Amino acid sequence: MRLVIARCSVDYVGRLTAHLPSAVRLVLVKADGSVSIHADGRAYKPLNWMSPPCVIAEADGVWRVTNRAAEQLVITLEQVLHDSTHDLGVDPGLRKDGVEAHLQVLLADRPDAIAPGLTLVRREYETGIGPVDLLCRDADGSTVAVEIKRRGEIDGVEQLTRYLVRLEADPALPHPVRGILAAQSITPQARLLAADRGLGCAVVDYDELRGLEPSIPTLF
């Protein structure tokens, strides 16, 4: 991971345009190829970012970050205060809570509950940056990566996107490769981002998968 703290301005050119005026910011360049710009606020959320895969061209204090859709982040560095690179190694990822772990087991037995025609290839398929929950095959023989969450949010979409970049480069897998975020509930923001990236969303019923009757209020 490369950490650059600099006074900079940022311009995004793509489906729309956006401009961040000059200020001191943190620029993160991760091993997966993503680039994000952060201020000293907004918790973990970046001011702007470019998801992998992308190409970074540096020249005369200007970074041009371009993705496959030809969208660009242009970062103009006026004063670099810090620039360092660190090898963080392979992250083991978050341990799933009890419900997520059980959902993974249940959906591995019933991948068709995610999408008709899915069959399981392997659970916990290693990508090099963490394991994708379920690696499946659809009726056409294409590879489908499934990330399972209790609640589907933007973080889950980002995680699945990173896995897909690795899987698309895996010559051992049948192509094309697509992804599905499966969860008990999925936020509108996550659905929008998933659709923008060509990912599928599947809402699964935990109780139904466990063979339980739905909870219906009664008078007695």
UniProtKB/Swiss-Prot annotation:
Cross-referenced Pfam families: NucS_C, NucS_N
Keywords: Cytoplasm, DNA-binding, Endonuclease, Hydrolase, Nuclease
Primary location class: cytoplasm
Annotated EC: 3.1.-.-
Highest taxon of the lineage: Bacteria
Broadest EC class assigned to this enzyme: hydrolase
Record GO terms (molecular function): DNA binding; single-stranded DNA endodeoxyribonuclease activity
Cellular compartments annotated: Cytoplasm
Region forming the signal peptide: none
GO cellular component: cytoplasm
InterPro entries, per the entry: Endonuclease_NucS (IPR002793), NucS_C (IPR048301), NucS_N (IPR048302), NucS_N_sf (IPR049173), tRNA_endonuc-like_dom_sf (IPR011856)
CDD domains: NucS-like
Family note: Belongs to the NucS endonuclease family.
Family annotation (HAMAP family): NucS
Function per UniProt: Cleaves both 3' and 5' ssDNA extremities of branched DNA structures.
Protein's name in the database: Endonuclease NucS
